[in-house]
A protein has these predicted regions:
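N-terminal Rossmann NAD(P)H-binding glycine-rich loop of SDR-like oxidoreductase domains
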Residues: 3-23
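SDR active-site strand-loop-helix element
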Residues: 6, 30, 70-76, 111-117, ...
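Conserved glycine-rich Rossmann-like NAD(P)H-binding loop of the short-chain dehydrogenase/reductase
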Residues: 25-36
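Conserved Rossmann-fold NAD(P)-dependent oxidoreductase catalytic core, especially the SDR/UDP-sugar
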Residues: 72, 97-154
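Glycine-rich NAD(P)-binding loop of the Rossmann-fold in SDR/ketoreductase-type enzymes
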Residues: 87-95, 149, 153, 157-158
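NAD(P)-dependent short-chain dehydrogenase/reductase
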Residues: 125-135, 160, 164-218, 223-227, ...
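C-terminal substrate-binding subdomain of Rossmann-fold SDR/epimerase-dehydratase oxidoreductases
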Residues: 207, 211-315
């Protein structure tokens, strides 16, 4: 099958390109000009199953190639300011709808869209108001695909709007729509300022780590496990389900992940906790259920510890 991946130069996009090529699938990678990560894509140019197209999403109708499956990752305004910019997020909505229409013209049968945990909008502040500051994480229900949604950002609201709009549009065009609610992904090539990247870099050099309280529930999925999950969503019969949480099998307090990294890397660093101001949209509180994904046969190959060891080349 031939897979179109938009946002292919992104952290997730590059790993998906590599994964699908390893499965001997054809990959049509779409990336905007001067995209960060473009050089990483160029190393696949000698692969006969790979084609790179440099094109902005606003010009998506100019794409010439046909494809069977589309994985839509491209999205503007993912930074702190952009997440709250309604105009930017509205442009993302328009682009996604245009892509669905293009899928019809290109005879594609399924479109997978990168939704987000931000659609739920559940925050640490919400949980503390309900359960108190000494809450028991195990007493709080997991977020399944039918849990209530209350996005706190324009980014989350746009992703949630497309859950309904793309499903309706896809049904009318006879294209199967899959809405992937992706949680927190880590791995080699992620931004150096991400929590995992910064902790790993400092712990490996035995440098002290200055960090917030990390009291919220969290869920990490290793990028190679995420690729496996997305691959299953391209090839499996989905039994009329179309919204899937894409996350790891383990939920725990975020500080637990920090201490796990410290242990795995056998670091001598000090973990110095600082009181920090909560983000504008609140402190995300992630506690997903992935039972629907497991029904498709998903099981982590790496998990958190295996992922840290793999990205750091530790046996």
């Amino acid at each position: 099958m031939k897979i179109l991946i938009t946002g292919a130069a992104s952290f997730l996009g590059r790993h998906l390109v590599e994964y699908f090529l390893s499965k001997n699938e054809e990959v049509l990678a779409l990336a905007r000009e001067n995209a960060r990560g473009m050089e990483e894509l160029l190393k696949y140019k000698k692969n006969t199953g790979f084609k790179l197209t440099v094109l902005n999403m606003k010009d998506i109708e100019k794409l010439e190639d046909e494809f069977d499956i589309c994985i839509h990752l491209a999205w503007g305004g993912i930074g702190k300011t952009g997440r709250m910019d309604k105009d930017i997020q509205t442009k993302n909505i328009v682009a996604a709808k245009n892509l669905m229409k293009l899928c019809k013209k290109k005879n594609a049968k399924r479109l997978l869209f990168a939704g987000s945990q931000a659609e739920y909008g559940q925050t640490l502040e919400d949980m503390e108001n309900i359960y108190g500051k000494d809450f028991d994480i195990n007493a709080i229900e997991n977020q399944d695909e039918n849990s209530s949604t209350n996005p706190k950002s324009e980014y989350g609201r746009a992703k949630l709007e497309l859950k309904t709009e793309l499903k309706k549009l896809g049904d009318g065009l006879n294209i199967e729509y899959v809405h992937m609610r992706i949680f927190s992904v880590f791995g080699r090539g992620d931004h150096e300022t991400s929590l995992v990247s910064s902790c790993v870099n400092n712990f490996m050099e035995n440098k002290d780590v200055y960090i917030g309280e990390c009291l919220q529930s969290w869920n990490y999925i290793y990028v190679k496990d995420l690729c496996k999950a997305i691959y299953l969503l391209t090839v499996k019969e989905l039994k009329n389900n179309y919204v899937f949480n894409i996350a790891g099998e383990k939920n725990q307090i975020l500080m637990g992940y920090v201490r796990d990294m410290h242990r795995i890397l056998k670091s001598k660093s000090n973990i110095i906790v600082e009181k920090r101001e909560a983000p504008t949209e609140g402190t995300p509180f992630l506690k997903p259920s992935i039972e629907l994904l497991k029904e498709l046969g998903f099981k982590e190959d790496y998990g958190f510890e295996g992922g840290i060891k793999d990205m750091c080349a530790i046996k």
